[in-house]
Amino acid sequence: MAMAAAASLLPASAAPTLPGRAFRPPRNSTPTASLSCDGGSRCRGVGLGVILGGCRAQGVRRNAAAETYVPGSGKYIAPDYLVKKVTAKELEELVRGERKVPLIVDFYATWCGPCVLMAQDIEMLAVEYENNALFVKVDTDDEYELARDMQVRGLPTLYFFSPDQSKDALRTEGLIPIDMIRNIIDNEL
């Protein structure tokens, strides 16, 4: 808890360093800590409180006020996100069903750094396009066969489905700017 205060109130150079972890502020944000892990872990430069590849900055939580403590577990859990995680069956129903708004599907993995970065943009867009688009996400580790069938090769991959089912879906792969996503939703669908 004290480390969280130090990491958020002090400049990165004054923040404490844990063995195997480096603290530094992310670009374009207020000073907070980010971490990198050694020992073959997949974590590098992600925001605190995000668990990737089993690596987490010890004693530091993203936003304790926004998390709920699970008694007896010693864990804090974040509330549900705005973008719903769906299964293969749910996605099939959404794609084949009648829609009045575009459907945007985010194929991601919890261990994927660019996926975590883009998830923040997707959440913001879900609020911005609340009544004009439907955003869902698919965890490729949980839905491997669906990801394979949808030819998801790199992460994150976004699919854009128009409400007009005669139009082909659009696909992007990799971390793309939020303005590009807006442009696709506003002009291409």
Swiss-Prot record:
UniProt-listed Enzyme Commission number(s): 1.8.-.-
GO molecular function, one term: protein-disulfide reductase [NAD(P)H] activity
Species per Swiss-Prot/TrEMBL record: Oryza sativa subsp. japonica (Rice)
Site feature: Deprotonates C-terminal active site Cys: 106
PROSITE patterns tied to this protein: THIOREDOXIN_1, THIOREDOXIN_2
Catalytic residues (UniProt): 112, 115
Name listed for the protein in its UniProt record: Thioredoxin-like protein CITRX, chloroplastic
UniProt superkingdom: Eukaryota
GO cellular component terms, A-Z: chloroplast
One GO BP: cell redox homeostasis
Principal localisation: plastid
Domain Thioredoxin: 72-189
UniProt keyword annotation of Cell wall biogenesis/degradation present: no
Described function: Probable thiol-disulfide oxidoreductase that may play a role in proper chloroplast development.
